[in-house]
Amino acid sequence: RTQTDAIAEVGQKWSLAQTITGPYINLKYPITQEDNGTKKVTMGNVTLLPDELSIDGQLSTEILRRGIYKVNVYQSELVIKGFFSSEELRKSNVDMDVLQYQRAAICLNLTDMRGLSEQVSITLNDSVYMFEPGMDGRGIESMGVHAIVDLSALKDDRKLPYEMKIKLKGSQSIYFTPLGKTTRVALKANW
């Protein structure tokens, strides 16, 4: 047994190293094409990244032993908040009137879903939405959770505030993808 084997064994039983990407919004819109007089409608996707992404968290770490090897694991409690704005949607060259705001998906990608210890929810514009497992073909990456939400408020050029709390465990490391125009991460840990 090598240290790599010990890390892999702990990762399979506890949870792997985590990379958190999001939240971000996916909006669908129809694309009409004409081919030999026949109209064909397909769906396009546009992704809206947050203007502000702030992550505050507490990591509780421990060391698990496998033979002579030690493997770091953690449990985290994260508060992710910020806001979205329709300004970036305007830059996408997609007609704002055809976007399907009422069936938008808010997405959060995770490396290892087994690390979630409770269902994820988000407060978005004073409404609470529960996430479902999987990305339903709407994510930047394939692993994660999503919620179908009504984002009609984005039509009105308003800021759309969000906040979510996540309890997530992992091993070895935790990473955050800096998707926001402004991204801030502040973690406290006992190691």
How would you label these PLM feature ranges?
Residues 12-13, 26, 34-191:
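Soluble non-transmembrane domains of integral membrane proteins
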Residues 16-28:
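Solvent-exposed, non-transmembrane helices and loops of integral membrane proteins
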Residues 1-16:
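Alpha-helical transmembrane signal-anchor/signal-peptide segments
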